[in-house]
Amino acid sequence: KRLRWHQTNPRKLGKNKIFFFYRPSDRKTGLLTLNIKIPKNFKSTLKTKNINLCRVNIGGFNAKTKCLENIPADIEIDSETKKVEIYPFSPLPSNKESYAVVFKVSNPQKSGLYQFHTFGKSSGAIPVASYLGSWTVRIDQL
């Protein structure tokens, strides 16, 4: 499933802020954990202090995309399997709010398309991990 995303700078080697959105239509249930699989060829340094989870206002033609409030969460990066695991202190509810994982990164040297996959563990009597969708981020040549 194709998910929405937004970035501030598409140029290669540029400082970038990438918003990976979790809209209400993307979440059927509340989410206990979020896993983001980073593509192998996305060569950029990720640090836990540069990743956060927040309630977000998705911008458009006349509004800016920005975080409204940060959601406290434990963030772990597994550099071998190239996965980011996010454990919010309280589960993300399945309400009408939009949430986003925000990466503050330097773009990789190679331009092209990078596909990030996300998995979520649903909150309920029996937590079930399931595939939520993918974001295809484009890095430009210029």
Where on the chain are the PLM-derived regions?
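Serine/threonine-rich, low-complexity linker/repeat segments that form flexible spacers/stalks
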Residues: K1-R27, N35-K37, D140-L142
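Extracytoplasmic
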Residues: K15, T29-T33, T48, T81, ...
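Helix-rich interaction surfaces within compact, conserved domain-sized segments
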Residues: G30, V105-L142
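Soluble periplasmic/extracytoplasmic beta-strand elements of cell-envelope proteins
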Residues: T33-K37, E85-Y87
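Solvent-exposed beta-hairpin/edge-strand motifs
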Residues: N35-L68
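Solvent-exposed coil/turn segments that connect beta secondary-structure elements
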Residues: P39-N41, E80, F89-P91, K104-S106
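Extended, solvent-exposed segments with strong compositional bias
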Residues: K64-K96
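Low-complexity, intrinsically disordered segments enriched in Ser/Thr together with acidic residues
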Residues: L92-K110
